[in-house]
Amino acid sequence: MPNTPEKLPHCRTSLTLLSCLAALMLLIQGCVTLKPYNPPTAALADEVQIPGLPGVRAWGDRPSESLQQSGRESLEEEKAANHGKLEPVTYGLALSGGGQDGAFGAGILCGWSQAGTRPQFKLVTGISTGALMAPFAFLGPAYDHTLKEAYTTISDKDIYKAHKPLAILLAVVNVKPLPALTENKPMEELVARLVDDKVLAEVAREHRKGRRLLIGTTQMDAQRLVIWNMGAIANSGNPKALELFRKIMVASASIPAFFPPQYFEVEAGAGRYQEMHGDGGVMTEVMLYENAIKPFSIGGERKRELYIIRNEQVYPQWKKVKPQLKDIASRAVDSLLKSQGIGDLYRLYTYAKRDDLDYHLAFIPKDFTMKSTSEFDTAYMNALFQVGYNMACCGYPWTKYPPDFNPGKYEQKPPPAPNPPLRSSAGETGPETRHSPH
């Protein structure tokens, strides 16, 4: 067992190494070159298009004529695919963010198919992990096996590769540029394997039938939500459609700082630029059509049903927080995201009331208390998938309101007004006279 004096050389060695590291950091700082990035200016923001694919994206915070037109066209396409008629009920599905908790939504969808009551959705939207499952939810029960595979067989190594601690340290002190703690090449490869030419062709086919698939990303420079018309991209025939389709899915699921952003080649005016896009959950944890489509008037007087799957627990969960920077920061961010997600559920409820949609909400139940041991814990995801599956195949009791919402008088419809009395030709009130047709 070495005595105390013998430990001192090790301490001196550590100090020497730290001194060398500091000198190296200063040396590197003088010669590092940032990766070229040429974003459009704010003045050009509303002119930005994907080269060769105009009208396939829109800002989520303002009306979009291209998405509005796509909605109108969807009615004619639906009629053409349905012998000139519109379905009496139209269904929408909104899939939220939640990382590995997306296993819950995958389980709900697969169990719903097993129950035999899962409808065909005219509109499917996805944010973050919801964006990864949205194309397969859109294509229906035939792709349940893909959903199950994606959320029950993967682990951390299938999604990301962490950078070395030294690289992260150099990035933190702004010496060596690094866009994130990890590289997401594994996730890109997973998406490329799951979304092939066949999937793209089937999304295009359903788009031509009047159905719509939308995914949201965050344009990081603009601090705005971008809504992508995925069916229009799939149906475009553009040789780069598949590459773009996959990139959008990855971008929507790229949590800033943990995953690197995705860069999109765009054009505006006479110039070519790059846009930086990250997780759609930065702007909203779940979306419908936001403000890109005016208050819903498309489709006549048919019944509309909106189903929302929130891949997260919505009620507070007690956890003893260690008085350390990492634990306090992690708990604060988790609480912020949970609060934002609840606010988004209320926002969609407001849209539902405005646009006459019946609101149905599913979320991870309180009694699911298993803790994950990593960012993508296979055992945890399998357990959560099974929870969602069992709930749905037994007839899931969808919640009609956002969490803790007390409808009170807000939901109480006034009694119908009595019919005004009929008056005779002499102006006196008399019984209603019914005339038989001739």
Q: Would you name each region that the model predicts?
A:
Residues 125-130:
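Gly/Ala-rich beta-loop-alpha elbow adjacent to hydrolase catalytic centers
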Residues 12-23:
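Sec-dependent N-terminal signal peptides
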Residues 32-123, 138-438:
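Patatin-like phospholipase
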Residues 27-30:
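C-terminal motif of bacterial Sec signal peptides marking the signal peptidase cleavage site
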Residues 10-14, 427-430:
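Intrinsically disordered, low-complexity terminal tails and inter-domain linkers enriched
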Residues 1-13:
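N-terminal secretory signal peptides that target proteins for export/translocation
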Residues 24-25, 428:
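Short stretches within intrinsically disordered, low-complexity N-terminal or propeptide regions
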Residues 133-136:
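Hydrolases whose catalytic domains are alpha/beta-hydrolase-1, hotdog thioesterase
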